[in-house]
Amino acid sequence: MTLVIGLTGGIASGKSTVSSMLLEKNFPVIDADLIAREVVEPGEKAYDQILEAFGKEIIQNDQKIDRPKLGSIIFTDEDKRKQLNAIVHPAVRNRMLTKRDDYINNDVPCVILDIPLLFESNLGYLVDKTLVVYVDEDIQLTRLMKRNEYSEKEALDRIKAQMSLKEKADLADIVIDNNQSVEETKLQLDNVLQKWNIS
């Protein structure tokens, strides 16, 4: 029987680092962010819906969506963010389910669904166990400002747009504390995999 793990965290919490560690161990990882990019490509149903909802001004010369421009709209307008999520989330969920079920049908021991908004989108029912990558907010803020060259306000707006990592940690089956070194995070992940008998 396949164990389905929901991996989540917050922006700049280190979730992608843990996801990469799982890939290195040859676990199949279904990445919601990658799928979210796929489903909004020209020719996809969600692309047409976004164009209809937000207008041509968010389209680049190559006909792809101008993600920074769309991002600046949705991070300052909650109604617009909800509107975008109502288009993108179902498309992402359906594609993730198809991929997950393919792995289950092929009897893989474990599959990871890497979903940043696992709890916000009420997607816990898609997985058997939840794993949250946690980091203190001050470290999260510093990492995000450095990584994306955001001002403190821009970084805080993006952090506040998501459920807090403390709330996510309370909902998780297991939490990986990513405040320390990458080596420490790797050690914690190894312990989790052993605990769940999938190392």
UniProtKB/Swiss-Prot annotation:
| Alphabetical list of CDD domains matching this protein | DPCK (cd02022)
Q: Kindly list the places in or outside the cell where this protein is found, as annotated in its UniProt entry.
A: Cytoplasm
EC number(s): the record gives: 2.7.1.24
A molecular function GO annotation = dephospho-CoA kinase activity
Concerning Pfam families, the annotation shows: CoaE (PF01121)
Major localization class:
cytoplasm
Give the reactions, separated by semicolons, that this protein catalyses. Answer: 3'-dephospho-CoA + ATP = ADP + CoA + H(+)
Which stretches make up the DPCK domain?
Answer: 4-199
Tell me its family.
Belongs to the CoaE family.
| Function, as annotated | Catalyzes the phosphorylation of the 3'-hydroxyl group of dephosphocoenzyme A to form coenzyme A.
Spell out the protein name for this chain. Dephospho-CoA kinase
**Species name:** Oceanobacillus iheyensis (strain DSM 14371 / CIP 107618 / JCM 11309 / KCTC 3954 / HTE831)
